[in-house]
Amino acid sequence: ESANDYRDSRNLLLDQLSTYVNVESYEEVDGTVSIYAEGQFLLESNVQHRLTTANESETSKLLKPVWEMGGDFFLRGELSYSSENDTDTGSLRGLLVARGKSKTTYLDIPQKPDESDYLDADGNLDSKAYFNATEEYNRKVEEYNENVQPSIVMTIEAEFDQLIHGIATMVNDTLCPNKKLTLADGTTITVLDTDKAPIGDDADKTIGAELFVRRETSRYTEKTVTVLDDDGKPKPVTVYQYNEENPNDHYSLYTTDQLEVNPELLRDPSKLPLSANASSGHVDGYTLDLCQDLLAKW
């Protein structure tokens, strides 16, 4: 009777284990049990092969199950559900799939190329460039579907970051509009459009103060560059060059974990650029059209 009780308890534990991971168990002739999990022995007769955890990568603090002896526990990929490959069983895999392998941002969501971005000054389409951009987009979609979409956490995180990025850049670009400037050597840079940009209501008439700032990257760098005047002669001008977002530099992105409300505006709200700039042609006071523009975009 005791032996049967032990056997029942063992079988119950095996049933519980099978809800966590996909296992196969075999009873040996001597009554011991061997357990096979994810292509390897978890229990080989009376020899137990233990699991532990390790970081997903050198840059991630997320944990994954690994064998103490070395090697990943899930050899056939954690971000996949497939009855054909027998990777649709077990709550542990389900949790790992839902969590994902890494943090995501708006950059992980593929952006379909806009045909209008590939038109020249005469309205002719650069078919080759547009085709290459479309091919790259399709490649990124496949990558997204394989590495991000299966994870609900990674998907929501990327979509939320895209929303935050869109709001932050929309507000900032309205308060601090930019323009392209051609330099004397023919290259172009992006600078603050000081003719159209509104100014603050403070004594210094602050210009170019964005509402949402990147913690490690300022919006502009003040510098002197050389341009050509109306007569084609070089002349130096002082500009506020926009510090572009760099996909390879996380600290340069308008992404959720890098954003904060401009501390300078919190200290002195009068610096928020909502007043008319004399160069813009607007009368003194608040730029009503700017406020209406913000509301329309919102």
Regions found by a protein language model. Give the residues of each.
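Structural signature of extracellular appendage/secretion-system components
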Residues: 1-298
